[in-house]
């Protein structure tokens, strides 16, 4: 068995091990419109935490910004902070959103505009536009990684992964997406811990790494200088507005089973 075959077989097993349980969960009852939009408002808080985490920490961070941190240092933590901060803002109206049974950002804005169709259409277009880069980054990140380690054509991998992604949506919309996100979030956390331990050992221990790395890489001011203050400023004016208006975040808040939000701050943490 070649390395490429082994990688694809392992990937297929992980996908199936995630899809099958979530498919069974989604098929316990008939699929409704609410299942597709807000998972029938039945998601436990721990699933919401997992799916929000997986939505925020997708391919852009796991691949792009991980490489960015390798090149420019600890300043990349600012991006992670800006990604998490919107959750605390979303938490403020969370109970009101859930009690009013909203499902989408356009629906919320139409509520404040006397049910204006123009506002609804404009909001719908922007709701698609804002997370478009995040969504495509998942596909391109997969293509970049697997093309490098397998030698398979990058464009072909992106197309295949697009269709695989549809398999997570087709059974019951957000209900299956949320549960698969939760499973993947657990997997991401475990692999993060394993990777930190493994890489630290490869580097000869934390003290050895700190003594050999460029001091600017582990200094916030030096790292910002390497990265560019303009880049950090652009993050502030793109990630923050994008986060507090992100349909993905609001949709999952509206899908929480309970209207009690004492634990919702855990999403941001």
Predicted region positions:
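Membrane-interface "cap" regions at the ends of multi-pass membrane proteins
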Residues: 1-62, 169-172, 185, 191
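Residue-level recognition of pore/gate-forming positions within transmembrane alpha-helices
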Residues: 15, 55-56, 83-87, 127, ...
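Small-residue-rich segments of transmembrane alpha-helices in multi-pass membrane proteins
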Residues: 43-51, 112-122, 184-198, 269
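Membrane-interface helix-loop-helix modules in multi-pass membrane proteins
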Residues: 37-103, 237, 249-269
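Juxtamembrane interface elements at the cytosolic ends of transmembrane helices
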Residues: 17-33, 93-106, 167, 173, ...
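Helix-loop-helix module between adjacent transmembrane segments
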Residues: 18, 78-170, 235-239
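Selective recognition of specific alpha-helical transmembrane segments in multi-pass small-molecule
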Residues: 17, 125-135, 187-199, 232-244, ...
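Hydrophobic alpha-helical segments and their helix-loop junctions in multi-pass secondary transporters
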Residues: 21-29, 135, 139, 149-160, ...
